[in-house]
Design a protein with these regions (language model features):
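Charge-rich, intrinsically disordered N-terminal extensions
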Residues: 1-110, 116-150
Length: 150
């Protein structure tokens, strides 16, 4: 077990280094698109949390694999783990994820099909993610089985 954890930590460190480069390039890409410094900062902060907290939470997953993890992030993990989870923050993260994976597509790191699937999933699932958040935050719901729509 200690060897497995040491390997996980080593893999995570390598991914964090790659993520730092990606985030710097993403920041430059957003700036070139004409976004304000504040907006660029918000998008980069959102992606830092997604890449370096969520994707590395249980396994060492590189940024490219995150395109397949948006539903579990916005529909469950973010609601559970982020104290600041709100309707507006879920929408903000969704916008950031679309921008980041558009950037990743332009860099040739994900396919057009994967990008299209991500955008479709966000559009289709957003109402359910927001409803899940509302149930999670409802003080009258005491049984967590009533929160998550499995």
């Amino acid at each position: 077990m200690p060897d497995d954890y040491a390997k996980y930590e080593k893999d995570c460190e390598k991914i964090r280094e790659e993520n730092a480069k990606l985030l710097a390039d993403f920041s430059d890409w957003l700036t070139a698109k004409g976004l304000s410094e504040k907006t660029v900062g918000n998008h980069c902060s959102n992606m830092d949390f997604f890449l370096n907290r969520f994707l590395l939470y249980e396994d060492a997953k590189p940024a490219e694999t995150g395109v397949f993890e948006v539903g579990s992030f916005l529909g469950y993990w973010f609601i559970q783990k982020a104290m600041w989870a709100s309707r507006s923050s879920i929408k903000s993260y969704a916008a950031t994820l679309k921008k980041f994976y558009t950037f990743m597509h332009e860099k040739g790191r994900i396919t057009q099909e994967d990008l299209d699937d991500l955008k479709a999933e966000i559009k289709e699932e957003m109402p359910e993610w927001l409803a899940t958040l509302d149930r999670h935050d409802d003080p009258d719901i005491t049984d967590l089985n009533d929160v998550w729509d499995y």
